[in-house]
Amino acid sequence: MKKILVLTVLVCGIAMSASAQTAKAQWVTIVTPNLKCWECKKLLDDYLNKVNGVQFEKGLIQWKFNLIKGEIRIQYWPDRANPNAIKTAIANGGFDADQIKATEDAYKTLPPSCKRAEDGGGPKKGKPCHMEPHN
């Protein structure tokens, strides 16, 4: 009887230890001021899908865009990704990410609507670009 009790306690302890080591998914909100347009959203979405498998080992779970605020919220596994690596990946995709500026080569490939406001990009008066146009 004592052996069964000891074995049960041991198994429960190992199971609790294993579940305690599982990292919880976390969220990070990143300001991307040149992310104001549905076209920019599509470009960044495609880029994140591409790097998620290569760079982050599927560590990015999901992301949500707020085109009005120019923000992206990303849920990630902390054992596979971290906020600085995510910001660097966004910058490598051509978009500013908090204080990290987009890499120049990637930024040059963006369409005019996805450029920084000081470079003539972003929404134009009377043309909201946060909504996909209807054909």
Predicted stretch roles:
Residues M1-A25:
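Bacterial Sec-dependent N-terminal signal peptides
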Residues I14, V31-N34, Y107-K108, P123:
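Processing junctions and N-termini across compartments
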Residues K24-T32, L67-R73:
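Acidic/histidine-rich, surface-exposed loop or edge segments in extracytoplasmic proteins
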Residues F56-K64:
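A short linear hydrophobic-aromatic micro-motif
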Residues K64-K108:
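Mid-chain, structured segments of secreted extracytoplasmic proteins
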Residues Y107-H134:
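Short, low-order "capping/linker" segments at domain edges
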